[in-house]
Amino acid sequence: MAKTTRHNSDSQRGLTLVEEDFLDEFEDAVPPVPSAANLRAAEPGPRAQARTRRPLPPSPEDSGLEEEPFLRVRRRVPVRSGPLPSWTKHRWGKILLASLFLLALGLILFVVLAVRHFLDHDPRFEISSAASIQTMGNSELSRADLLSVFGSDIGRNIFFVPLGERAAQLESIPWVKHATVMRILPDQLRVSIVERTPVAFLRIGSRISLIDAEGVVLDMTPELMAKHHFDFPVITGIDPAIPLAMRAQRMQLYLHFLSALNSDSQHVIDQVSEIDLADPEDVRATFNYGGHELLLHFGYTNFAARYRNYASHIQTWEQLYPRLASIDLRYDDQVVLRMATPPAPPAKLDAKPASPAAHSHGRKAAHHKVRRVIRHAHPTHHATRRAR
């Protein structure tokens, strides 16, 4: 009996020592308590320690056992059905669905036709008179000029008026640059135009017209002349029969010429009475100077520099050559002056008629007499005769 008691006490003592070592390591990891007295007061007795302090179960690493795999529960993915209800999968369901579709399509078509019939035949959408057509943007053209395009549309439904065709007919009028036609419910049309702006007079034979920057010839009526006082140079050398693209190119050359002359002085263009654009490589302008006219050849470039050359020497040339009629400024370092041919003396009655060869020789001689060449280059340099 004594041996058993002793053996039990030794076992308990060894267990207590192991537990105390484990508690020492555990207490080192736990942060210190605020007060040691409170800790001793809260410490349980020896019997409670023996009852609660039991050895920890061995870990899987120490025991050599493998950890059981974590089994996840798979979620069931719901199977989505189609947009159609389940009864459409059967034969009679499909027939019913097709019938409903055809019924809806027929109903939509019926509504569209009914609305179209209402819009096409209702008298409230008919153009009753010319007062139902509004015009905007016309200053040179009269309202009657624009309404002449819509003569067949009076009494017609506005939805039957071809707007694109009417706009094209308006733009065929020379003064109309751009036209827009739109419907205004219930029974009106609105016509808006942009008119062309003339930039010069155009002389075609004995008739004088206007022309814009794109080469479009504009008729000049007496009413238009009484309304405006245009102050443009007169252009020659543009035939309305040539293509519009060629006319537009020559008008761009004309505008470039005016811009170059106006860059030096605003009143230079007032001296120009006529501009000949027949040759696109030689702009010929007629200037008024000293009570008579001078024909100047400017070529097709360097207009401002060539005009300054003319303006700086014209007084000297007029003093040296009173019969000066033409000045060719196209060359780089020389100016060609041409004099007016003196009138031929009246032929005597008893004089024999000269032969054609004599007339030709006389004209050539006169031509050589009235031509003067003034060189501006240095004497050691040769003058260049290449025209620009």
From Swiss-Prot:
Matching InterPro entries: Cell_div_FtsQ/DivIB_C, FtsQ, FtsQ_C_sf, POTRA, POTRA_FtsQ_type
Membrane topology note: Single-pass type II membrane protein
A GO CC term assigned to this protein in UniProt: plasma membrane
Keywords: Cell cycle, Cell division, Cell inner membrane, Cell membrane, Membrane, Transmembrane, Transmembrane helix
Signal peptide: none
Subcellular locations according to the entry: Cell inner membrane
Keyword Plastid part of the UniProt annotation: no
Transmembrane segments: 95-115
Domain (POTRA) ranges: 128-196
Positions in the Cytoplasmic compartment: 1-94
Record-linked Gene3D superfamilies: Cell division protein FtsQ/DivIB, membrane protein fhac
Family from the record: Belongs to the FtsQ/DivIB family. FtsQ subfamily.
Job description of the protein: Essential cell division protein.
Name of the protein: Cell division protein FtsQ
Organism: Acidobacterium capsulatum (strain ATCC 51196 / DSM 11244 / BCRC 80197 / JCM 7670 / NBRC 15755 / NCIMB 13165 / 161)
